[in-house]
A protein has these predicted regions:
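Charge-rich amphipathic alpha-helical interaction elements
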Residues: 1-143
């Protein structure tokens, strides 16, 4: 599941039918469970990506410092050993393999931020429904 799919799903689920407020209030626990399940899944995926990042970071560190197995250099030659910390950091920052995993972690962070806001909105939905009911009562002349 990607961010676009979650956003489209929320766009459909976020609509409150003003004519069926009682049904909408009953859907709140289901929506909470649905989006919290997605939140937990994405959190686990992010943790796996962090684990992969640490593994790739060690592999790339060994690669740039000349400590990787010979087979690695046969597949991907690197003629020098980087000994300077600053140069090593520049190589690590520019490393494509490391950047891909880091980008995945950032993507998961964005998804989690969106889901946190969705869950917060779902939690506040009872107040929105209550306000809508009070507005209907006010319009009907009941106080």
């Amino acid at each position: 599941m990607n961010l676009d799919q979650i956003q489209e799903m929320w766009q459909r689920d976020s609509v409150i039918d003003p004519d069926n407020l009682h049904d909408e209030s009953l859907k709140i626990p289901q929506l909470h469970a649905k989006y919290y399940t997605i939140y937990n899944t994405i959190t686990l995926l992010r943790e796996k990506a962090r684990e992969a990042y640490n593994r790739v970071k060690l592999e790339r560190y060994n690669y740039y410092t000349g400590k990787a197995p010979i087979e690695v250099y046969e597949e991907e030659p690197f003629p020098y050993k980087v000994r300077d910390k600053e140069a090593l950091q520049r190589h690590m920052d520019g490393d494509e393999k490391l950047s891909k995993v880091e980008l995945k972690i950032r993507y998961y962070d964005i998804m989690l931020k969106f889901l946190e806001e969705v869950i917060k909105t779902i939690s506040n939905r009872t107040y929105q429904i209550k306000n809508a009911i009070e507005w209907h009562r006010f319009q009907a002349g009941f106080n």
